[in-house]
Every structure is written in C-alpha cells, then in structure tokens.
C-alpha cells in the first residue's frame, strides 16, 4: 500500500498552514528532500525510528531522521547512536552520517517535524507537520514491526502504536 490514501487528507488540511509558514523562508532540508523518508513504501517498513526535527546545520539535513548526506561527518547524536550500536551489539558505525543503508533494509527514519530554519532547532514545530507525521505513524500500527522511540517527543508517539512493540530510551543528543 501507498502512503497517499493515508496522508492525502491530512496534507490537504495542513498544507495551507505549512506553506504559509515556509513562504519566503529558508528551511532545511531542501524542498526535494522534505518527504524523503516517506519514499519508502508503507508495506516495506519493518522498523520505525522517530526523530524530532531535521538537523539545523546547513548541509546536514537530508530528509531522514538522524541521517546526513554521504560524506558528512556524523553529528553528535549519531555518534552516540553508533557508540551504542557498537557497545550493545558490536556493530561499527560509518565514517559518515549517511543512514541510507538502514532505509534500504526497511528502517523508516521519520522526524516528527519535517523542516527547520537553519540554525534554529525546533523552529517549525506546530505549523502542521506533527499532524502529517502522526497520520503516517498511525498507519504503521501493525505487525511485524517495531518502533524505536528516543526521547520525550518520540515517546509521545507510542500512543499511536498500540499494537507495535516499542523500545524507549533517552534521546541520543549529548545536549
């Protein structure tokens, strides 16, 4: 199944607010990557990892939570994720922050808010993205799937996934 029947009604409802908030503003990631995470077909999602919002550093955000463009040094949150992977299961992280290989294996890296003003984390909260990503998360309430919820914002999504096992822990940010 496609995301379209799930998301079209809420996008239609929220888009006027979102487009008004973004109009004439610089934002990250680039427009063509804003919904990149949702290019993964709905029925291919095996793991959901929920992020907060895109990296606010220009050149980092690429439309998938916690991931960067190839060749970009991993931000501190991702360094901590790589460290936990190594310490817990012996998997070494990449030299860069590109998590496309995870997405290729069915890991949906979805931020709750899909855009951010450069240098201003959290700047696009409450403009309509949360309603859209809530609809996407609710569509994933099925098995076989597991959700990884790092931090309070992500853990608030557990209520949208009553039939999905959820792994919860603090946000990997060092802040």
Predicted features by range, described:
Residues 2-161, 165-175:
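A polyanion-binding, active-site-adjacent surface
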């Amino acid at each position: 199944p496609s995301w379209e029947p799930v998301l079209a009604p809420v996008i239609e409802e929220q888009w006027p607010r979102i487009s008004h908030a973004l109009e004439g503003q610089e934002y990250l990631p680039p427009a063509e990557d804003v919904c990149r995470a949702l290019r993964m077909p709905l029925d291919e999602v095996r793991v959901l990892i929920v992020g907060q919002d895109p990296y606010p550093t220009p050149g980092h955000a690429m439309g998938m939570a916690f991931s960067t463009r190839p060749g970009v040094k991993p931000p501190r949150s991702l360094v901590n994720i790589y460290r936990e992977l190594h310490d817990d299961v012996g998997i070494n992280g990449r030299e860069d922050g590109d998590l496309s290989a995870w997405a290729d294996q069915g890991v949906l890296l979805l931020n709750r808010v899909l855009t951010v003003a450069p240098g201003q984390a959290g700047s696009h909260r409450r403009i309509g993205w949360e309603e859209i990503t809530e609809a996407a998360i609710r569509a994933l309430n099925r098995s076989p799937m597991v959700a990884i919820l790092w931090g309070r914002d992500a853990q608030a999504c557990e209520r949208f996934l009553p039939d999905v096992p959820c792994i919860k822990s603090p946000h990997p940010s060092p802040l």
